[in-house]
Amino acid sequence: MLSSLARVLQFGLLVFTSIFFLVDPLAAIPTFLVITAGADTGERRKTAKTAAFTCCVVLLGFAFAGTLIFRLFGITLVAFKIAGGVILMLIGLDMLRARRSPTKETLDETREGAEKENAGIIPLGIPMLAGPGSISTVMVLMGQSSEWWQTVCICIAVVITAVLSYWILAGADRVRRHLGDTGSRVLTRLMGLLLTAIAVQFILNGLADLGVVKSTK
């Protein structure tokens, strides 16, 4: 019983950290403040809620439609593991340098979003929160989940990440004030280090499935 609970907790923690670090709502704070400049508290909360809800729907949608997408385009899970790992590594390395990764969102997308009423959907919800890295991660995790509780863990992790993203964006002013620029950079680098390690593991798992390297599981 205890060993089973430990497995669930270990898997749940891995899934949550992978998804949360990729969604990275803390890194979205500067853009959120620019987009919502001049808005009152109610409007900011509404935008934050829209962004978080969009992120949740997109990630859950791709999580459950992943298998269908694989079949439709003839993509194997092994190929997606390796490709997803490469994307995660690029994002992680950019985070280690404490800079916004262009694989998540371009400057043009940020500028365009600032001029739109639905900025909570684009670019905040997509691609800032639900970007290529987080989408590919939930698809890979769901694709290699063989038991029902693993699927539940992934769904719960996505929902918790969306809720935390809302809280962080809704309180963007307070979060930025407490952390400061230096604190934000330090936290970003720590998250980047963990994300890079997860990316390496994704790639190793894919290579192990191909028989290129010995399994590390």
Region annotations inferred by a language model:
Residues 1-16, 71-82, 145-157, 212-217:
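Interfacial loop-to-helix junctions that mark the boundaries of transmembrane helices
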Residues 1-22, 98, 105-125:
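Small-residue-enriched transmembrane helix starts and helix-helix packing motifs
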Residues 11-63:
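Juxtamembrane transmembrane-helix termini in multi-pass membrane transport proteins
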Residues 17-20, 29-35, 122-127, 135-144:
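Generic transmembrane alpha-helix signature in multi-pass membrane proteins
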Residues 40-53, 148-159, 185-186:
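Membrane-interface alpha-helices at helix entry/exit sites of multi-pass transporters
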Residues 40-41, 61-83, 164-209:
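Transmembrane-helix boundary and interhelical-loop signature of multi-pass inner-membrane proteins
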Residues 46-99:
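Membrane helix-loop-helix hairpins that form the core translocation module of multi-pass transporters
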Residues 87-109, 198-209:
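Transmembrane helix exit motif
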